[in-house]
């Protein structure tokens, strides 16, 4: 009951973010606003998405990159107002939901564990997702119309 209520509230009040669809294994560039004193600048952070957790307002994702031989991980709240935009740089296919094992791998070894997907494969995946989303919306709309008809008949 309460989780259903929370979901409805989140749907109503969460901002609609127009980020590209990305998954674990994708290489993304996150443009994050940083405030230093009275100045504000945008800092890009590029790396592999190693984790996506949660849903709704608490959804976060973790991006890992290696800089001068040192691994850097940064966790971003998905609905943060400080995220300016997210770009998908490279599409990778992995067989795990969490890529924590990349922490032990260095350089090329980590890259070899992620299979690169061709652009046409990615576009086909996006089309299938969009079709499924439209079909779900149609079904929900029909269910609402049926519920309204039943209320009117009652």
Swiss-Prot record:
Annotated SUPFAM superfamilies: Translation proteins SH3-like domain
Keyword Ribosomal protein: yes
Composition bias, Basic and acidic residues: 128-142
Keywords tagged on the record: Ribonucleoprotein, Ribosomal protein
Region (Disordered) location: 128-154
Pfam families per record: Ribosomal_L19
GO cellular component: cytosolic large ribosomal subunit
Record-linked Gene3D superfamilies: 2.30.30.790
Biased segments, Low complexity type: 143-154
One GO term of the biological process aspect: translation
Ribosomal protein listed as a keyword: yes
GO molecular function per UniProt: structural constituent of ribosome
Role description: This protein is located at the 30S-50S ribosomal subunit interface and may play a role in the structure and function of the aminoacyl-tRNA binding site.
HAMAP family found in the cross-reference section: Ribosomal_bL19 (MF_00402)
Family: Belongs to the bacterial ribosomal protein bL19 family.
The name this protein goes by in its record: Large ribosomal subunit protein bL19
Species, as recorded: Aquifex aeolicus (strain VF5)
Name of the gene encoding the protein in the UniProt record: rplS
């Amino acid at each position: 009951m309460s989780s259903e209520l929370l979901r409805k509230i989140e749907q109503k009040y969460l901002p609609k973010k127009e980020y590209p669809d990305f998954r674990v294994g994708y290489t993304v560039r996150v443009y994050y606003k940083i405030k230093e004193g009275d100045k504000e600048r945008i800092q890009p952070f590029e790396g592999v998405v190693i984790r996506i957790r949660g849903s709704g307002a608490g959804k976060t994702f973790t991006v890992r990159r290696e800089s001068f031989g040192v691994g850097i991980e940064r966790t971003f709240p998905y609905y943060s107002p400080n995220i300016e935009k997210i770009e998908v740089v490279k599409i990778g296919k992995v067989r795990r939901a969490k890529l924590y094992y990349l922490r032990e791998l260095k350089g090329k070894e980590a890259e070899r564990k992620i299979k690169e997907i061709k652009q046409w494969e990615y576009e086909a995946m996006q089309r299938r997702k969009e079709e499924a989303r439209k079909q779900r919306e149609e079904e929900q709309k029909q269910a609402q119309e049926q519920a309204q008809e039943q209320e009117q008949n009652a």
